[in-house]
């Protein structure tokens, strides 16, 4: 998922339209995956015994939609490094949420490791991190996206307790698209690409970043505490910063 801000920079659609297409173009592949999952494992999708079974899906979809909207705008209003690093502060909010909602306990080793990981991510980004007053709104959006992503991680853990990775990914995509679509229409109208040059960054976002990258995250959340999974995502700003340095000549 470290490639996400790179594809977004290449996208010629508006930020929210980019977020919508990231989800919409992923849905066909996720449907195929769900069909395969049902056939192979005889699992079930969207079979809710009560409203409580539906709540995690609704929360996952809402938080992911909020994260995508704010994150896509942040990348366009500040540097790739700033947006990525601030968004990955979600690890802190995820740890707090894990403690409050799941009773997760963290050892001194984990806390020290988390601190070192955060400091390491900041130091590896080096001078690419810029605190420019002109970018303050974009920086705030990046931080707000971190809070939304923490909500997504915590809700995903709850959803994965009952449903497969394929089911959570498909359910999240459908609900997120429902939330994002009216926002895109309200802003500037949904931008529909007309050339391959306009389509390829969106396809990359949908198929590589979302279907592959996001699915691996959701899969891992069934086997790891939310906070520990979030710590692993701190490699994302390093990857994004490296690509931004190479492709966009952003300082590193």
Predicted ranges, named:
Residues 17-28, 72-103, 145, 226-245:
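Specific alpha-helical transmembrane segments that line the substrate/conduction pathway
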Residues 44-70, 137-145, 192-212:
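Loop-to-transmembrane-helix transition segments
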Residues 3-13, 18, 25, 69-78, ...:
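Juxtamembrane C-cap of transmembrane helices in multi-pass membrane transport proteins
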Residues 34, 97, 106-127, 145-146, ...:
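Hydrophobic transmembrane alpha-helices of multi-pass small-molecule transport proteins
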Residues 83-89, 156-177, 210-246:
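Helix-helix packing/entry segments at the starts of transmembrane helices
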Residues 1-21, 30-33, 59-62, 70, ...:
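Glycine-/small-residue-enriched transmembrane alpha-helix faces in small-molecule transporters
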Residues 2, 6, 31, 61, ...:
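Hydrophobic/small/kink-forming positions within alpha-helical transmembrane segments
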Residues 23, 34, 38, 127, ...:
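C-terminal-most transmembrane helix of multi-pass membrane proteins
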